[in-house]
Amino acid sequence: MQTNNSKEKVRQLQNKLYLTAKKCDSRRFHALYDKVYRDDVLFEAWKRVKANKGSSGVDGIGIEDIEEMGIEKYLSEIKSELMDGKYKPSPVKRVMIPKPDGSERPLGIPTVKDRIVQMATKIAIEPVFEADFRDCSYGFRPKRSARQALEVVRKACNNKGYYVVDADIEKFFDNVNQDKLMKLAEQRISDRRILKLIRQWSVSGVLYGNVLTISELGTSQGSVISPLLANIYLNTLDRLWEKYGLTHGILVRYADDTVIICKNKKNANHALNLLQYIMAKLDLKLHPVKTKIVSMWDGKEGFDFLGMHHRRMTTETSKGQLYKETYQYPSRKAMKKMKAEIKKNVNGRSLLVAKEEDLIKNLNPKIIGWKNYYSTKTNETWMQELDWYIICTFTRWYNKKHQRRKHMSRVGFVRNSIYEKGLKKMARA
């Protein structure tokens, strides 16, 4: 299997497909399946799946097992199965992920083989749909990010965006209509073998314990292909909003997370009504409690979006003039999640034998990631709070390790020690 320069070859393939799709929005692609089992595409798919890590699926075969078998041999077997039409996906292994509120979120884990085939399929079909996706969509797309979505929201709120429709699509991934999804996919793809793959992944079933469940609704949250399928499905919302909703407000969508920034309450009510109408066309519903219209006018209310809380607050210019500005800072849920992660990585019972340097080494990448995402010019207070929490957590660890009765004694000593040993700070100051 030739794998040299696979990344560049894949980039050229995707660019060609994108430009072809962009030239004609009615063109349907009939020869995509052979791209899925190309050597360079399969190898690039493997590299991406490996980089994403993740545990094994129902077959128990993990990344390390495949490396022991031999990557080239394993990919050649997948290629043969695809070429001969013998590939059949396995059920998705379901695990329950704890949420901050105490409830659980189901997550589907496909086998590594299925993840590779899904990634290869995504490489082949994503450029075609990218040509149709709208500017208001930011989630799980090339060269687009949550930070970009947050910046659009911030600017829209500052530009007389006094009312916000904070929308929550009820159990989106569980309620995607598979037949409608296939019809939307068929608008751009006529290759029956690609469509068969997408359908197979939808009906392969979910294994939870020893119980196999096959549903006619939904797409597995956690699979490689599901974010792209979500964007294909919700592109209908984006297109209809572009056609009918721009006079009501600015739609910003990140996968199924959606907000609409409006200039007055009347527009917000119209926006919500239109959104409910579009959801009905997609066989989806807005959560009756979580979906709400938020007044940003006086700063008494705010909303959460992509881990950030948004609220208009009074600030002061260098000349002492007061004005309102939209502040973005970590939501309560995000703060709670970060603090739990800090505690897990520093103050766990099994970590009492660890060296301080090792704890710092493990925590620093997380701090850098959080800082890159959450740090803004308006949220220094929250970053300082997290820095103090980290200091306190290290202090508790230090005192437990040295069997001191007072958990917060020697806090100054610990603070100096961890920063001297290279601990990163969340705050800029």
Model regions and ranges:
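Core structural elements
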Residues: 37-42, 91-92, 100, 202, ...
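Duplex nucleic acid-engaging cores and interfaces of nucleic-acid transaction enzymes
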Residues: 113-120, 182
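A conserved non-catalytic segment of reverse transcriptases
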Residues: 203, 282, 286-354
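A terminal-accessory region detector
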Residues: 380-429
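Conserved polymerase palm-domain catalytic core
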Residues: 74-77, 81-96, 100, 132-297, ...
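A glycine-rich phosphate-binding loop feature that marks nucleotide/adenosyl-phosphate handling sites
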Residues: 254-255, 291-298, 359-363, 383-391, ...
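Short, solvent-exposed helix-loop connector elements
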Residues: 214-219, 327, 343-358, 369-382, ...
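Non-catalytic, polymerase-adjacent accessory regions of viral genome-replication enzymes
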Residues: 1-67, 72
